């Protein structure tokens, strides 16, 4: 069995269409939408609405950890925009999702990232797409558990959860061969982004589950340029499957 795994697609419908070439199935660990790209400030929903210069300003404030100023800057921009902000975001997100799900291979097993809008997915799913969150499946004798979303952060992205709610989804899965999540377990070396020069938020519940149940693999994304992309915890190989928007390449899992 050969499965390809991607995360942090962030609008790369072109590469997504070929992501499962040579594989029996695709697993997608979320973050399909592109709101703003730190490496390409002209791309994404935010610059589409407010322009590249505004995106650069927002990125600069966030990178400097000036989150209150970044939020105030965003509020000022939204206040000057015609129409309802929520409707403008959803319209832009719907356009991205339509393109992404049209390119998504079948069969695909998906969970949500922290920048995704789960309520919008159903309208775009194809027959071969299965969304899993706090759920498990079996593929050719191996069990896969899926945990979607992120944890609360200063960035206030759309799909962030409280620790308790996230931990409940991890607990609902139980022991599996492969633990699939958008965010990493709470290990500093997996959470530090070397380009953004900041720590992202990881899950203690995932780390505890790995230590106790010892899956063969723990797969995740979220940190685009991690200090370390793989660590071993007992028998479990923990792997950041990569920033798909940047690389266009899936992680390959065989058994």
State where each predicted segment sits.
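Proline-aspartate-enriched helix->loop->beta-strand connector
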Residues: 25, 176, 203-210, 214-223
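Short hydrophobic patches on amphipathic alpha-helices
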Residues: 20, 101, 170-171, 210
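Active-site-proximal beta-strand elements of phosphoester/diester hydrolases
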Residues: 1-10, 141-153, 177-182, 237-242
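Core catalytic region of metal-dependent phosphoesterases/phosphodiesterases
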Residues: 6, 11-139, 241
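Active-site environment of divalent metal-dependent phosphoester hydrolases
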Residues: 10-15, 33-36, 111-121, 152-155, ...
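Binuclear metal-dependent phosphoesterase catalytic core
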Residues: 136-140, 157-158, 207-212, 226-255
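Binuclear metal-dependent hydrolase catalytic cores centered on His/Asp/Glu-rich metal-binding motifs
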Residues: 140-178, 196-205
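Short acidic, glycine-rich surface-loop motifs adjacent to enzyme active sites
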Residues: 173-190
